[in-house]
């Protein structure tokens, strides 16, 4: 079934606690995860909380990647929302699971804007992504 976007909601457990509290590493790896999907990064913003924890967003032309960490519990909540057929959010999931040294994860995928529910013909191209890609090339 075609959709405007794919939204992966991931929970990473038993992660490297030091990694989850390192804002520079988190930002670097979230950007790298975006590149892994084939996405185009527009902007990013990250914040470190005291005494610990990091939250951040990587805005991509195709939507966004977000993270919230609880280093004291070895836990990270991650959303990977991508639009268009040329990006694969599962590549970001696999990359982050490895980088965070997550011993277990819970993940669900939600199709956003299903063509049949929005009223888009099944063979219609994704206009927003096509327009954005035209600007790049």
From Swiss-Prot:
GO terms for biological process: spermidine biosynthetic process. The keyword Lyase applies. Its EC number is 4.1.1.50. Is synthesized initially as an inactive proenzyme. Formation of the active enzyme involves a self-maturation process in which the active site pyruvoyl group is generated from an internal serine residue via an autocatalytic post-translational modification. Two non-identical subunits are generated from the proenzyme in this reaction, and the pyruvate is formed at the N-terminus of the alpha chain, which is derived from the carboxyl end of the proenzyme. InterPro entries: AdoMetDC_C, AdoMetDC_fam_prok, AdoMetDC_N, S-AdoMet_deCO2ase_core, S-AdoMet_deCOase_pro-enz. It is an enzyme of class 4 (lyase). Disulfide bonds: none annotated. The keyword Lyase applies. The modification Pyruvic acid (Ser) is found at residue 63. It catalyses: S-adenosyl-L-methionine + H(+) = S-adenosyl 3-(methylsulfanyl)propylamine + CO2. Pathway: Amine and polyamine biosynthesis; S-adenosylmethioninamine biosynthesis; S-adenosylmethioninamine from S-adenosyl-L-methionine: step 1/1. The record marks 62-63 as: Cleavage (non-hydrolytic). GO terms for molecular function: adenosylmethionine decarboxylase activity. Binds 1 pyruvoyl group covalently per subunit. Keywords: Autocatalytic cleavage, Decarboxylase, Lyase, Polyamine biosynthesis, Pyruvate, S-adenosyl-L-methionine, Schiff base, Spermidine biosynthesis, Zymogen. Belongs to the prokaryotic AdoMetDC family. Type 1 subfamily. Catalyzes the decarboxylation of S-adenosylmethionine to S-adenosylmethioninamine (dcAdoMet), the propylamine donor required for the synthesis of the polyamines spermine and spermidine from the diamine putrescine. Heterotetramer of two alpha and two beta chains arranged as a dimer of alpha/beta heterodimers. This is S-adenosylmethionine decarboxylase proenzyme. The gene is speH.
